[in-house]
Every structure is written in C-alpha cells, then in structure tokens.
C-alpha cells in the first residue's frame, strides 16, 4: 500500500510537470499552448480599431483558414485588456433552422450558454424569463437588458453566420439593426462581428421566399466594413515551420519552403497538413531526418488521394450548378469575361475554390487544381483501370524516355472509339475532352510518376 502511494505520487508529479509537445494542427481552432501557429490577427488587421469605434463588421474567409482561431484570440485579448466584455458565440447549431420562431430562441440559448460557461459574468443573468413568443423582438430586448446590467461595453463575435437563412437570418439582423440605431439612447451591444465563409452581400441570396423581402430598411446596412482573412505569406510559412525547428532541430530548407508554398499558396490548412504528413507519417517523427522537396511531393499526393474533410467538402461543391457555371470555363481554357459583381463568381471566390490573379480566374492553388481535375475525371479513370487500357507508363518508355508519338496515337484511337459515349457521363460536358485526356494520362502514370497540369484560361488549352 505504501509503495502504491509513492508510485501514485510520482505519477502525479510527472503528469503535472510534463509539457505537451506542440504539433501542427489540422482539426479545429489552434491553441498557442498546444500548436505551432501564426497569430491570426496579423492576417486581418484593423479589427481593434473598428471595435473602438463601436462598429459592426463582417469577416469572411474560406473554411479552415483560421476564422475561429482569430475570434478566440480576439475574445481572450479583449477580456484580458479589461476595457470590454467580449463574447464568442457560434451559430453552427442553427444550420437548417429557417423559421425565426425556432431560430431566434436558439440563438438566445447559444448566447446564454456562452455567458454562463465563460465564467466572466458571475453576477449577471441573460434572457431570464425571456418572452420567446415575441421572437421578432426578444433578442433585442434580452441584449438591451444584459448590456444595461454590465459595467463595461459588450462586444459579441458571431461565428458561422452562414448557418442562418430565411426568416431566422432576417429576424436576427433586423433586431441587431434596431438595437444599433437606437443605442445612443438605449443600451445595446457596443460592437458586433459577423463571421463566416461569405461576404454579407451574399446573405441576401439565402432569403428564398418572396414574402420575406428586406424592404427599404435593409438590415444589411448596419455593417461598416467587410474584411477577409488572408492566406499565409511565404515568410509566414517559414516562420511557422521554424517553430518546429526550434523545438526539434529538424530543418526546412528554402527549397522545401518554396515547394510547400507553391503547392498550397499559403492556404493555412494545407500548409499544416503537408508538414504534418511529412513529419509524423513519412519521417515517422524522426527529427534527425532531413526534410526534402521530394517529401513535399509525396505528402501532397497522399493528401490528394486521402481526401480529408477539407478537400471533400470543396469537391462536393462542384456538383452545384452555380459552381459549374464558373469553373467549367476555367477547365476548358475559355475567355469567359466574368462580371466581377456576379453572385456565382463571387460565391466561388468566397469558398476559396478559385482566385482572381491579375484578372485571370484560376484554382486557388495547385492542390485544389489537381483534386478538381481528378474528381471530375475519376469515373473515367476507374473505367480505364478496369479495362486495362491505356497501359501504364512502362509501355510508353523507351530507354527511360517517354514515347510521345505512341502515347498520343493511343489517345487519338481511344478518343475515336469512346469519346461520344464518355462525354455523356460528365457533369461538366463542355470540359469532357480535357477531362478524358487527364484521366487517360492519370491511368498511364499509375505505376509511378506524376502529371503537372496548368489550366490555361483564355487559350482553350490544358
């Protein structure tokens, strides 16, 4: 019994004294005590100034780009500074709740949970005895009473604002607007942030029923500024990876950083996913081993084939008609001449699927370009795999050199025999020739090798 107590005591000491090793995070918000990370506030400057000016604002960025991490950082910083009460509120549970009679009470419950469990409001209650039958005004009344009871101004950052739609969205914004315009006389929220994937201009597209019009007093006009959370720069990728080097001694050369940045273009989830795959899977956490550009290529291929949720959620969007209308001309290399105010065009940009680079619409990074092509041509490739044609790469190699004439001759014959049937299989029918070619080439390199594709917008080439 005595030995057991000593053992327990030792275990307790070891457990409490052990520092968790930091790692590259690819799931959920980042925590500076657990994860290697770049502070998100540096990628979205000017928020503090908007809060000081009592403004309501929007931050939008693609999924897994650091939005929630930014909000949690900001809430902690504001509360630590002591000038404001800052509250984080996720609206994710409101997904699909269109009816404001159900949606507004749910928003109030989310706020109540955040207030209760934060521990920052021990002597103040929120929405006690709230009249939920008055769903067109209960949110405003609850926030007004709460703000009146506080000694400091209240800042609320609403995450996952995209989850609101139709009646719930209108009732939510209208009550914020009503409180906003009268707050010089009646207490209300000092500053509000609405954070999601979309710019607020596109929230109007989520109002489907004609009777739910915005009217002349649009609730959207309370927003002073719309901001986005940019991707990492190459220098920030280097700084992020250097944190791992400082702890482990494992070095990332300039060539490795260049390769990672080229493949990811600084998209935060991809930047973390590539290095995590290299460090933990390819090199098996052996920090004595050097990281090479070849490891980057290997990690990228694994991520493409594995199709994590981050990749899969983007690929599911390709089925949407509004996405197809924008993406298909990019695949076929046509000069589309997009209207930069077109909702579908802006939707694709907001999702992070495409970027406008010097007036040319392109996939946001080579990884996205590759997964888009492979997704759209996957059925064709599987059919080729089962038929055994075309043969894999060795059949086209002569003394280690690719026999282009034989390869193209086989493709021409394949096209003559199959193109009419196969084109009907594609969702993106205009891009079918390009997709069949990519599937053909992917089948050829299955036994080893890679294809590097460039989408030549405006030149009708791949």
Where are these regions (language model features)?
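Walker A/P-loop-proximal flanking segment of P-loop NTPase domains
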Residues: 7-65, 69-78, 141, 145, ...
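Mid-core helix/loop region of P-loop NTP-binding domains shared across ATPases and GTPases
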Residues: 110-158, 163-177, 182-191
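Winged-helix-like regulatory helical subdomains adjacent to P-loop NTPase cores
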Residues: 235-238, 242-351, 357-358, 386-390
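The catalytic "switch" region of P-loop NTPases
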Residues: 28-29, 168-263, 277, 281-285, ...
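Active-site metal-binding core of divalent-cation-utilizing nuclease and nuclease-like domains
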Residues: 440-462
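A short, highly charged nucleic-acid-interacting micro-segment common to nuclease
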Residues: 165-166, 397-398, 417-435
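Short, amphipathic alpha-helical interaction segments positioned at domain boundaries
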Residues: 369-399
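Conserved catalytic segments around the Walker B and adjacent sensor/switch elements
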Residues: 80-96
